Amino acid sequence: MSSLVKIHARPKLHEPNMLAAWPGIANVAMIAGSYLAHKLNPKPLAEVVAPYFFDPIGVLVRDNVVESPQFPESRFFYWKNTPGKKDLIIFIGDDQPSSKTYEMAHTVIDVAERFGVKRLYTCAAALTRIHHSEQPKVWGAATREPLLDDLKARGLVMGGDLQISGLNGLLLGVAKERQLDAICLLGEVPQYASRFPNPIAALSIAETMLNILDIEVDLAELKEQATEAAGRLKEMAAEAMGDYIDYFTEPIWERGESEEEEEDDSPGSPN
């Protein structure tokens, strides 16, 4: 195993799948991945040696005492399914490194191979013209054509040509280089809401992911988050529309007399 990874446990896993997630657009991947990790309560498996990939840019001071440099965590967990079903490894990266992303992806695949992972999954956002009041669909992308057949059968959208940015996408390409099957589930996010966390899209992804992995998880809390987010998006959209109307229109009682006279004297005005 690479010196870039610290192994904490060596469990015997049954044909495990792996789910990997980093922060990304609308934080969709992290919301979905972190929620499943929280609910499944998996056990620590390994962690990436952070100082190799991240450079601290400062320190915290508490009660006038300087603390040691803090690094984003990149951790692996394992969860054992019921006998006969496939186990699961979950990787959660608190942040994406500004460089060495290709090496980070290979490091994650190293762990996947070490524990016999059969298939890798990532999540991402699919920016579309969907309205915030619509139920987001889930798109699918895979490293091999045969993998797409199952996704199509489950009703996933085949988006054709697209780009998956960051490590949630790059990991798929590295998996293909290493001949490991990999799939990405992308939840639809309105283009105008890409900067806001979107548990609505994360919920759609989580429902699809659990179905594919044959795992049961209570999604009630995530559904509550999605409902709250839908309300906030509705409010933001209403405010934005109000600002738009205010900017491009002007109440007639705020016009000066000179403006009204100019309109009366304009060509084509009735006399």
Task: Please report, for each region that a protein language model flagged, where it lies by residue.
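N-terminal short beta-loop-beta anion/metal-coordinating cradle
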Residues: 1-93
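Fold-independent oxyanion-binding glycine-rich loops
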Residues: 21-24, 92-95, 123-126, 187-188
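Short, structured loop/turn "capping" segments at alpha-beta junctions
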Residues: 118-119, 180-184, 215-219
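Catalytic cores of processing enzymes, dominated by hydrolases/peptidases
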Residues: 129-212, 248
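A conserved C-terminal secondary-structure "cap"
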Residues: 193-271
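Hydrophobic/aromatic beta-strand patches that form the interior of the parallel beta-sheet core
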Residues: 46, 89-91, 121, 181-186
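Conserved active-site and cofactor/substrate-binding residues in soluble primary-metabolism enzymes
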Residues: 24-31, 99, 103, 107, ...
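Internal, conserved structured core segments that host functional sites
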Residues: 86, 96-146
